[in-house]
Amino acid sequence: MMALVCDTAVDDIEDMVRITDVTPLQRQAARKSVVPRARKHKQETGEQMQTDSVIPGMQKVWLKTWGCSHNSSDGEYMAGQLAVAGYQITEDSSDADLWLLNSCTVKSPAEDHFRNAIRKAQEQNKKVVLAGCVPQAQPRMDYIKDLSIIGVQQIDRVVEVVDEAIKGHSVRLLGQKKEKGKRLGGARLDLPKIRKNPLIEIISINTGCLNACTYCKTKHARGDLASYPVEELVERVRQSFQEGVCEIWLTSEDTGAYGRDIGSDLPTLLWRLVEEIPEGAMLRLGMTNPPYILEHLEEMSRILQHPRVFSFLHVPLQSASDSVLMEMRREYCCADFTHLVDYLKERVPGITIATDIICGFPGETDEDFEQTLALVRRYRFPSLFINQFYPRPGTPAALMQQLPAHVKKQRTKELSALFHSYRPYDHKMGEQQQVLVTEESFDSQYYVAHNKFYEQVLVPKRPEYLGKMVQVEVYECGKHYMKGRPLEEAPLRTAYTTAPLLKGQVSGHTQAGVCEPQCWMPDGMRILAVVLLLSAVLLALLMEKLL
């Protein structure tokens, strides 16, 4: 294993997980039923009896997701299972019977949005089910008291929880999936899902991590590392391409740590997946922390040069000060990070390195912060995620002596100003690039594409471009994007042999012809359900009068 550049003494990473049994295990099948929390009322009211008589599976559900691509993937799986069960997934929150709120606990503002959404749902008398990292990490918080929760390891049972919530019961499934005492990666990868973008498949390759960062709340929710077996991931990629996907995102809390719990590693997985990527499709690797990628730099440089893999890597630094990194328990030093970046830049020409910086961590001095500014000036990262430090409840960093709010805010502004002072793409004016077109821009004026280095290129909004590889000439450069003029003589290239699924269509549960989100319950079953529902309501009213 490649030695870390710094001399900081840290525990051997491989000592942090048990790998005595490396045999991949099958995920547990979902339970058929769930026991709702018992009511304490001695006598039910007529309204409660009518609620209990409601037949679930016909209502409209609005799903809102905050946070990372792992959370987005969980949301897609939950939407797919609910649609297969007969629920209609709606984009109109006001029209929904139930709100499924999939939360993020990384930063305080994200949790604030989550809390506000709960309050708004209650004001509108909506049924509510909570998901994601916030309720998993802190299920006893007052503002989620008595609300139903689906844990991050239990998303394959979302239908059970929503069914009970629709009937007025409070249900909480927060356990971990284990078999023979070994933690599993999570829900099965072959579950039905509704992709937010039918052209992009987001695959979680592992859940949890090996770190114990002092500021991180996600660890409380996602837990320790648990990787999916290579063969399951390969099969999921195959299925995705069979459904018209042209771009694969691999995600997790730390992709670089993949496989350490099952006797494998990230390069082994990537070489297997590369074999499955058809011409005209691309693979994007998600975030990796520095310690776990250092020993694989040579292999990773070859993988990132592959024509069907984006030459892009997201490696969070957080601070260029070794003393701050030590207080964060990041298990690397700044020299490790610079070695990684320099190595990849030399061997993967043009590679995009994205990174994260936390401004105002407890104990950060002016000198510490200046070291971070100097490193950003040196590398001029085209993609830089700047975060003002917010102490998260229950983390060691929340107990440390905090910096004044105005200091944290000022440092955040200073780093942001530095980031916006340079333009990373101006030298690419006039270049000819091959780009993969996957989505519509926020203003609906362009299609959004990405070149080999995962740099954003806007192209004219022509239907024939979507899902295709297009040859363009760059004619305009902005801070965060380029604009490309398609070369008419260059042929369009596509990865798929079958058309992509329609927006709202369920992956792994397709039907012939056009399939709207509400079509997964046969008409006869819907009619029977309506009859049973009306009968139950009439019976409840009759019993109320008799009592």
Swiss-Prot record:
Explain how, and how many, cofactor molecules are bound: Binds 2 [4Fe-4S] clusters. One cluster is coordinated with 3 cysteines and an exchangeable S-adenosyl-L-methionine.
Q: Where does [4Fe-4S] cluster 1 bind?
A: 68, 104, 133
List, for all copies, the residue spans of the domain called TRAM.
426-488
Spell out the PROSITE patterns in the cross-references: MTTASE_N, MTTASE_RADICAL, RADICAL_SAM, TRAM
User: Residue limits of the MTTase N-terminal domain?
Assistant: 59-167
Q: Which domain of life is it from?
A: Eukaryota
Which GO MF terms does the UniProt record name? 4 iron, 4 sulfur cluster binding; metal ion binding; N6-threonylcarbomyladenosine methylthiotransferase activity; tRNA (N(6)-L-threonylcarbamoyladenosine(37)-C(2))-methylthiotransferase
Which Gene Ontology cellular-component terms appear in the entry?
endoplasmic reticulum; endoplasmic reticulum membrane
For this protein, the record's PANTHER family field holds: RADICAL SAM PROTEINS, THREONYLCARBAMOYLADENOSINE TRNA METHYLTHIOTRANSFERASE
What's the protein called, per UniProt? Threonylcarbamoyladenosine tRNA methylthiotransferase
This protein's gene is called: cdkal1
